[in-house]
Amino acid sequence: MKLLTASALAGAAALALLASAGAASAQDVAVTANIGVTSDYVFRGFSQSNEDPAVQGGVDITVGSSFYAGVWASNVDFGDNTEAEIDVYGGFRGEAKGYNWDVGLITYLYAPGANQDYDYVELKAAVSRAIGPVTAGVAGYYSPDFFGADKGAFYGELNASYATPVTGLSVSGAVGEQWLNVSDDYATWNLGATYAFAGTPLSLDVRYTDTDVDSPAIPTSDGRVFATLKATF
């Protein structure tokens, strides 16, 4: 049932994208693509690749000034036969009185699909504000049927970034809390720097992440430093 629901929502998002794209003129549609490699695919403090490297990539489309949608994929390793994660997402973003807002839906699908409880959907809402070189924001993600369970979950996050005087170099970090209805809640945080190489599509992000999960049985939640090299076209 989770797979059918997630697939249906992904299809609805795709139809909405096509409808919006059809209503817009060609110059209102922008398409970008990205591909990258990371030393460890980390999501909310947990390694999704069993602390091994991952290859990732996606395509994004923006229609007009507000509607966006895209698809993104990465290899994963949960110690079973699951090999890939595919995210399909869409939403609307805009600006009001100096605040940037973003509301959307993200569908997480896992292949080859033997573990259908992995698939889930999240509703997203985020607000941020830029003051000079500093941008601060808050975001919330709610899933009625979270990863690996049949229960709801909520993730809340405070984040900030700083565009340094060095051209192309920014520093960013976030503190979040994952509330789970099937197990203990946990906190996670990260801090890192991103450098965009001038005249190229390349950027390099180096980041430290950790959680307050203290269990030898869950080594994928330990503190770690990982690096991601990405090209955006």
Regions found by a protein language model. Name each.
Residues A26-D77:
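Short glycine/proline- and aromatic-enriched beta-strand/turn motifs that initiate or cap beta-hairpins
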Residues V37-F43, A73-D77, G94-A96, T107-A111, ...:
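Transmembrane beta-strands of outer-membrane beta-barrel pores
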Residues V29, E51-V55, T82-I86, Y99, ...:
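Residues that define the transmembrane beta-barrel architecture of outer-membrane proteins
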Residues M1-A30:
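Cleavable N-terminal export/targeting peptides
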Residues L191, Y195-F197, P219-F233:
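Outer-membrane beta-barrel "beta-signal"
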Residues G58-D60, Y89-G91, K124-S128, E157-S161, ...:
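Outer-membrane beta-barrel architecture
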Residues V31, S65-V71, G98-V103, G132-V138, ...:
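Repeated loop/turn-to-beta-strand initiation elements of outer-membrane beta-barrel proteins
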Residues S47, F67-A96, W101-D117:
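Surface-exposed loop and membrane-interface regions of Gram-negative outer-membrane beta-barrel proteins
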